[in-house]
Amino acid sequence: MEKDAFYNITRKEKVQIESAMNPLIITDAKEPDFQFYDISSPFVVMLETCRESDNNCHIYQFSPDNYHNIELGLSSNFALTPRPQHQHSCIEFMYVLSGSVTNHVGNQIFTYEAGQCCIMNKNIRHCEDFSGDFQAVFLMLQDDFTKELLTDYEEIQKNTKQPEEENLIFQLIADEQNETLQFDKIYLDCFPLIPADDILERLSSLFNALVLETINWDFGSSFLAKAIFTRLLRLLGDSSMFSINRIHSHSQGQEFLFNKISHIMKTSHGRCTREELETLLHYNGEYL
């Protein structure tokens, strides 16, 4: 199992090292300020811990039989350089464990708080800020892998006496297999309906089991990993735990913003102030 730690390296050096050693492959696109992320393994799990007060950010990356520990000083040239937006070759999940994460999606900027989650299909351009204090889990799943998860889920749904309500996460995975929707830019906003700590208590055992299975990859691990992912996606798509909003990023800016505001007001039962909306959406209160 390969391990490495990167300290204050340049962007070029980082790309070169990752391309040589890492299942996460980052390439610069022809367009300026844009990168493309690909993965060479069925899935990648990343845990990002940012501590601005301690001037560092740790990225722990797990994939089958592979582990990387990347450390960035927040005062380094790499950390201070504006991150280019990127696009994935696969679906990406972001779940905020603690603190808040600022996410740039196209020309919009949003803040996700602890307990909130977003799922993006492969056509969404975005980037996260390495700033503030937060901890978040990122899951990247190849198309072939999600297809297997979907097949298993649909088989269970077909044979159970009480099928579940529509799971929007598995629906997004199904849409990725649909050629007529291959160019749609869709992501899901997931806001907790119950206390974030209660959700994390249920998710943490699955996150831990997934990481342990990944770094101790052995016979049967692929089956166990699929089972854990299926349970994770079922929980994240549970309508009793999350209010999930399906958003098309190619909507006009005002329509896109309206969808976000509507979802926030719905999940907060109308108790979100204009100042709180300013913080979450990075817009002037008068404009909102």
Identify the meaning behind each predicted range.
Residues N259-G270:
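Short, amphipathic alpha-helix enriched in basic
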Residues F78, S243-H248, Y287:
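Short, Lys/Arg-enriched N-terminal segment that forms or immediately precedes the first helix
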Residues L235-F242, S268-L288:
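Basic/polar phosphate-binding segments, predominantly the helix-turn-helix DNA-binding elements
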Residues Q157-I228:
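Amphipathic alpha-helical segments enriched in hydrophobic/aromatic residues interleaved with Lys/Arg
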Residues I199-R202, G253-I261:
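N-terminal positioning helix adjacent to the helix-turn-helix/winged-helix DNA-binding module
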Residues M1-H104, F110:
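Generic protein-terminus/edge-of-domain signal
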